[in-house]
Amino acid sequence: MRITISGSPGSGTTTLGRSIAEKYSYRYVSAGEVFRGLAKERNMDLAAFGKIAETDPAIDLEIDARQKEIGESSDDIILEGRLAGWMVENADLKILLCASPECRSTRIAAREGLTEKQAFEMTIEREACEAGRYMEYYEIDILDFSPYDLILNSETFSANELFAIVDAAVSSLLKRE
């Protein structure tokens, strides 16, 4: 089974992805892990590699291509990333987590040690930048939810409730196999 989990920063994709991967003993691959792997391959620290990535579209394109390749050639895997649902066309279940910018900013502030105002401003700026890149590189409108099978509001449901919903969906799909 191939599962993708996408969502904006702070929506809970990592928490959900790791929980589902642990339950089913699936491999978990995040876009962040792919980014770190590319930095390591180039013998660069993350800060330096991140600076290059800001201005070099080839890095984004390579991260997305690697995630697509891993997802389409692997079984029993969870792929987590903003574009995972778009990139892994043969996924069995494509999940999108949503939450308001205010909710996500609160989570990011707590996780990153920022004020909520800082987190909110950073989040809005990052999302606008990403939306532009996704449209430019792939003609993907990040607000088009059509590729997704399951869209959940992580502001409405707790992490445990999200896990239970997705667990039920995965169990149902596994029974079909």
From Swiss-Prot:
It is found in: Cytoplasm. One of its GO terms (cellular component) is cytoplasm. It comes from the Archaea. InterPro entries: Cyt_kin_arch (IPR011892), Cytidylate_kinase_dom (IPR011994), P-loop_NTPase (IPR027417). It is an enzyme of class 2 (transferase). Transmembrane segments: none annotated. Belongs to the cytidylate kinase family. Type 2 subfamily. This is Cytidylate kinase. It comes from Methanocorpusculum labreanum (strain ATCC 43576 / DSM 4855 / Z).
